[in-house]
Regions:
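Unchanged
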Residues: 37-61, 68-123
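N-terminal strand-loop-strand
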Residues: 1-32, 59, 63
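Charged phosphate-binding loop/patch that engages nucleotide di/tri-phosphates or the phosphate backbone
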Residues: 114, 118-139
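Short low-complexity stretches enriched in small and charged residues
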Residues: 14-19, 37-44, 59-65, 127-131, ...
Length: 139
């Protein structure tokens, strides 16, 4: 079984927006705003909608090519594919969706990988490579 989730890696002034949520055991983990597609949505439409729902931010996708990762879920019985699109905020103040998100914060891009304990570690290499390709400074 395969599931798909789409979201945004939001960049602003050499920082990235991380959201904190709790796992089934109640432990806080860091991630990006993302969620499941609704009927008929494209991957990018899902990413923009989920970002708005979870953070109240309107975003502009700055790269149509997703950074893709994934992991096993449901006790290893399904694979969750995660497509993340690089975006920038257009307007809005962060207001978290309290039933899904515990907190949100801007973190320097070059310090953000320490928030993941191996989870999303592949995303950071892909993100830095992509930023270099797009000529976006991540220092």
């Amino acid at each position: 079984m395969k599931e798909k989730s789409c979201g945004c890696i939001i960049l602003k002034d050499n920082t990235v927006l991380l959201i904190g949520a709790k796992d089934d055991a109640g432990k806080l983990f860091w991630s990006f705003p993302k969620g499941y597609q609704e009927n008929g949505e494209t991957d990018i439409e899902t990413a923009i909608r989920e970002t708005k729902e979870e953070t109240n931010l309107d975003v502009k996708i700055i790269d149509d090519e997703s950074i893709t990762t994934g992991h096993l879920i449901h006790g290893g019985t399904a694979y969750k594919e995660i497509l993340l699109f690089i975006a920038k905020p257009l307007n809005g103040e962060i207001k978290i969706q309290e039933d899904e998100v515990e907190k949100a914060k801007w973190v320097k891009i070059n310090e953000a990988s320490k928030y993941f304990d191996g989870y999303y570690s592949d995303v950071w290499k892909k993100l830095l490579d992509r930023l270099k390709y797009l000529k976006i400074d991540a220092s």
